[in-house]
């Protein structure tokens, strides 16, 4: 290949980066040149037929990498219409990481697996596609409907909550659209239930997953972003989750996001140590505002036995039958624990935080 041709490919790689997509070969000559570069290590190929510069690729997070691949696939397969979680991702909605792949496309012939499992097809017809940043996908309400009926409640809640949070549709519009699709679709009741459960006050995907997990365990749906005033100086705080009991008791639930300690951008100018200090102060203030504060991590949320045990121990109320089977205490733990030892909670006094 000549120097001039190499320069042309470099320009096209630059343009692909500007468009936030993977580069695709446009003729046999460019295909050969890219294969040569791949052997040399000057380009990487995240999927067959898609290319990018390694240094550029490594700077992208998982979500951006997925979007780059989706846009690249669209260039190769221009008739494809993306649907489900892939369409949600392309439309800027929050999507659980485990749903980034396989990429889902609409197919009137039903469910199939293509390209070694990288592509999954789903039977989706009847809605005219829309184009979002170069990606052909199902329109927003159809995307939400498919996510709500195909995904688990936890996964669907992440998508639906983020849609409401961004103000793209109202809850009433979403429920009405889902109810209008009762004829000819599977999973309509499941989708409608998910739409009614959705709440745009959830601040992030982690809070959405945690709330759905609470519901699956039979707990009453919490109120979100309840405002409380700290008694010392009247500062306002907003609770991730809260439950007000008939006797007036206020139970607060706080999701401990590890990212605020590990991501320098979220930690702020003071760094991770300062972020931890601020979180400690917040925790102590909430202890003064609320009758009980239960903190939990996403790891706890993912353990149905531990999460159920934790919330129950704090008196979080239940108002319906669990929708999942709650595991019992593992046998090896039952054998090692005396039957008379209760589950104890550590109560930390305010002065322990130096206030």
Where are these predicted regions, by residue range?
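Surface segments flanking catalytic/ligand-binding clefts of nucleic-acid enzymes
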Residues: 1-12, 25-29, 164-355
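Short gly/ser-rich loop at a beta-strand->alpha-helix junction or flexible surface loop bordering the NTP-binding
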Residues: 1-187, 316-355
């Amino acid at each position: 290949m000549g120097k001039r041709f190499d320069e042309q490919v470099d320009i096209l790689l630059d343009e692909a980066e500007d468009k936030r997509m993977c580069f695709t070969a446009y003729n046999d000559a460019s295909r050969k040149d890219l294969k040569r570069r791949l052997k040399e290590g000057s380009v990487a190929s995240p999927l067959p037929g898609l290319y990018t510069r390694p240094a550029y690729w490594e700077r992208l997070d998982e979500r951006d990498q997925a979007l780059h691949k989706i846009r690249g696939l669209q260039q190769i397969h221009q008739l494809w219409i993306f649907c489900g979680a892939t369409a949600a991702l392309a439309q800027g909605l929050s999507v659980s990481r485990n749903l980034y792949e396989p990429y889902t496309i609409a197919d009137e012939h039903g469910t199939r697996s293509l390209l070694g499992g990288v592509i999954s097809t789903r039977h989706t017809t009847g809605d005219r596609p829309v184009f979002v940043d170069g990606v052909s996908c199902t329109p927003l309400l159809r995307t939400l409907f498919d996510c709500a009926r195909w995904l688990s409640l936890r996964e669907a809640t992440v998508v639906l909550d983020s849609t409401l949070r961004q103000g793209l549709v109202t809850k009433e519009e979403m429920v009405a659209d889902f109810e209008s699709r009762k004829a000819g679709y599977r999973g309509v009741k499941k989708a409608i239930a998910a739409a009614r459960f959705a709440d745009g006050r959830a601040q992030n995907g982690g809070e959405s997953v945690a709330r759905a997990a609470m519901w699956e365990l039979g707990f009453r749906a919490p109120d979100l972003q309840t405002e409380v005033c700290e008694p010392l100086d009247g500062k306002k705080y907003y609770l991730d989750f809260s439950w007000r009991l008939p006797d007036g008791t206020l139970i607060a639930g706080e999701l401990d996001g590890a990212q605020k300690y590990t991501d320098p951008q979220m930690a702020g100018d003071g760094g991770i140590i300062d972020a931890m200090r601020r979180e400690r102060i917040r925790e102590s203030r909430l202890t003064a505002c609320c009758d009980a504060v239960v903190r939990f991590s996403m790891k706890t949320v993912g353990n149905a036995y531990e999460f159920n045990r934790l919330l129950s121990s704090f008196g979080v109320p239940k108002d319906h039958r669990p929708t999942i089977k709650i595991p019992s205490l593992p046998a090896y733990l039952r054998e090692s624990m005396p039957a008379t030892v209760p589950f104890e909670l550590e109560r930390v006094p305010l002065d322990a935080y130096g206030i």
